[in-house]
Amino acid sequence: MNKRERVTVAFRGQETDHIPVCMWKHVPSEYWADDDRFADYQVRAFQNTDVDFMKLSGDKYFCWPSPLLEHIGKADELFGMEPLGRMHPHIRGQIERTKKVVRGLGKDCVSLYLVFAPLSCIRLQIGYPMMMKLIRENPEAMKYACSVVAEDLKLLVRGVIEEAGADGIFYSVQNAEIDRFTAEEYRDWVTPSDKAVLDFANSVSDMNAIHFCAWEGVRNRLSVWEDYRAPVVSWSRFIDEMDIREAQEHFGCTVWGGFDNRPGTFLYTATREEIEQETARMISRSGGTRYILGSDCSLHDELPEERIRWVSEAARKA
């Protein structure tokens, strides 16, 4: 199997010649101003780590540039939210840059583009405190704003897949920490816009992955995502305390993860031999199918790329 064949088969939950590997880091800010340099950085990361496919970063676009959000103070103002539109630089810029990355990676590389859920897009612009203030002040206003963002995200999803050539999206859903919302609040306030984008993405591609993000280090209320469907689920093995076989059974599909992404943990400190042994153990625990070896979330800048390559090479021997 070549890399594309291996990853495509893994997304279908079928047996591969070996377990695919994909871990990722963000692109440093000094590369953001030049799309060619940004693309080259991601292509070199693919080559240096020898992973089986690439999760494409959305760095530089972790915001939502709605003029209304710049000075938002009251929740009712969210009813004035307007779409950016398909020609807005925030949408077009991501599509055009992704074209360059996909072209540089070549036809053998499956690529998934990072897309944040609507509420996270708003939060990235205004911050957690204001997000929580507004949604508790008037949940319906925030739901409306999220629905507007969702329509723009559909334009982005279609563009990065059909125009830029990405195979699918890496859809990051967040904000389900056990101390943030009750299950009822999340399902009422957040789920509609989450699923609007997810369902649309699944209508465009059968190569999407859902990322149940635990970047904040707090356990997620996983029950609120039980009806979120995609061929692959990326989950937090350590924060959400769910091992590989348990995740396969819980999510009912191919699962992606395994290593703790946080600084100072095993992948950052272990010897090459220890990493090779742990790679083999995780693959064994997976049963050898319906598994992609990765990390809980984005790896930090201080992790040398050669450590990811150790995992890639070890997976081929396991």
Model-derived segments and their meaning:
Residues M1-P28, A33-D35, D52-L56, G85-A318:
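Active-site loop segments of alpha/beta catalytic cores
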